[in-house]
């Protein structure tokens, strides 16, 4: 009889994924539990922290989100940044340049009023001339109206993720990289731990924050998630501080399906495209750096399709060459909402995924909300709109689901 191998490790709570969401959950758990010998927290990832989707994020911290729950999660991230700066004694480089939401048509003005109407933060309404004074790269003639939210900004996503990591470590959280998680082990309807390429780790609670790999990992426990990996992409112009000053606000331009922000004297801009590229989560490689996302569906095709309207709104783009193209995978859901909280099918399994291109912005709120759910406490944000099972039983690998998730990205109008 072959003896069962002994577990290689154990923890009270295991977080799978050392991207910004996993680190934010670990940070929040660590600060509630403390380092005084209470419940232990272990973060596991095959990659070094923050080297996958987090490292490629545009990291717009826009507060106008279209629904109160998501907006509350973003507000909590601003609070988290302040808390981290105080704890670590350093400036995390939050650029509070504000966000300018631009409407190029009367119909879009109505939609914009709805979007920012629920915001609890100040909003300044501007005409085309006012918008162009604030953002000189905009064409006043092309702007019908614009809403400026002066307290918004953007941040270096890796720097913020590393702050969560360091703060979590100070609170006693352990982080183990170089371990490939193969499955969540379930016994009699509840989590028993995780199987890795090096052996079994005992844990009665697992938080799935595995990003693009989260659907496959959840399926190993018999849970279907309503999400798919979808390509996100942006471009960076050559440095032209004469055209794109460093204090330029974040620009959200839904008529062009575009956003932009300053990047060291250049302009970083993204286009959502009429048809986003979604991938089969069952066929992902272990490292997204190995994916050919540049040409699979043509980053150039998306650029050409959206260029005319974007250049009409932002004519200086015609004078600036493009220096860089960046693509990576976000996880989008069919209804454009995060996947957060307990999985109803398996006791002890929680989700922190489905970032929908807003994972950096909502990271602090997600960390605190998921930590509260794990610990059975009342959080400040109701996670019901983000419940993993909200769309019913589904096949996470179906082409129809992938198409719906891709459409959710293409139709996105917030930051």
Predicted regions and their residues:
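Beta1/beta-strand and adjacent pyrophosphate-binding region of the FAD-binding site
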Residues: 5-21, 42
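Conserved Rossmann-like nucleotide-cofactor binding loop
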Residues: 21, 49, 213
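Active-site substrate-recognition segment that forms the wall
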Residues: 27-31, 59-61, 90-95, 190, ...
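Glycine-rich FAD pyrophosphate-binding loop
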Residues: 30-54
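Dinucleotide-binding Rossmann-like beta1-alpha1 core, especially the glycine-rich loop
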Residues: 58-134, 257-260
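Short beta-strand to alpha-helix junction loop
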Residues: 72-75, 101-111, 147-166, 295-304, ...
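Helical element adjacent to the flavin cofactor pocket in flavoenzyme catalytic cores
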Residues: 147-204
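C-terminal catalytic lobe of FAD-dependent flavoproteins
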Residues: 157, 304-404, 415
